[in-house]
Amino acid sequence: MPIINVKLLEGRSDEQLKDLVTEVTHAVEKTTGANKEAIHVVIEEMRKDHYAVGGVRKSDQ
């Protein structure tokens, strides 16, 4: 049972997230041979003020 964790900055539409789940599931199914019913995709959306690169929060850019 593959479990795929995806972390993204917030701001994508529900349709984009739905497409992401479909495409990730397909890629895992194709590359691992896992049955798609056994593939779990977990999406975590992060607030821009909770994510920083090089000491600068994304919300401050």
From Swiss-Prot:
Pfam family, one: Tautomerase
Primary enzyme class: isomerase
Family that this chain belongs to: Belongs to the 4-oxalocrotonate tautomerase family.
Residues the record marks as active site: 2 (proton acceptor)
Residues that span the membrane, as ranges: none
Annotated organism of origin: Staphylococcus epidermidis (strain ATCC 35984 / DSM 28319 / BCRC 17069 / CCUG 31568 / BM 3577 / RP62A)
NCBIfam families: PRK02220.1, taut
Top-level taxon of the source organism: Bacteria
SUPFAM superfamilies with a match to the protein in the record: Tautomerase/MIF (SSF55331)
EC annotation from Swiss-Prot or TrEMBL: 5.3.2.-
Record InterPro entries: 4-OT, 4-OT-like_dom, Tautomerase/MIF_sf
Protein's UniProt name: Probable tautomerase SERP0934
Molecular function via GO: isomerase activity
Keywords of the record: Isomerase
Keyword Isomerase: yes
